[in-house]
Amino acid sequence: FTDIADFVIMDEDGSVSIPVEGGTRMTENLVGAHFPEYDGFLVLSHFKGHAIAGFGGAIKNISIGMASQEGKCLIHTDGASHTSPWGGAQDPFLECMAEAGKSVQDSLNGNILYINVLNRLSVDCDCDSSPAEPDMHDIGILASTDPVAIDQASVDLIYEAEDGASLVERMESRNAEHVLQHGEEIGLGNRSYDLVSID
């Protein structure tokens, strides 16, 4: 990919702290040290299942995806560890993801466009070393300026799909929609949306 464009490893030079406003679990989020160099992002997410979060989409990418190594550990452990990502309780982890995402969005004054690609829909994340093969059809591509709305629409389309049972089970068994509920409660976005089809 370096033949296509230059790239930056956001946390290759460590972490920088950004504030979490209105959170119930976090007061700061640790993102990559290069984060302040940007005034906006296009967040392209392959929507899919996830072994811990239930699903991964826009919110996961602006929280876990933007976090430094230390920040990832803080999100996963409800602030208990800077060095290990394991051992946190499920709902607090989901709430920390929403709050970390809000800190990123607030720091950029909402200057983010989100695109979720709903294809090759597996119960597992691309970060899994041996993910399950997709077992449902491709759905399409969504775009929004609201990370909660785009992830809610993505979840709803999975529920509407005739072949979405395995991904629905993955989401429900992880209480995945809690990240959307908490995200809406803290002002990250809105679960209500209008789905406009563009052919």
Show the residue positions of the predicted features.
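Extended, low-polarity segments enriched in aliphatic/aromatic residues
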Residues: 1-199
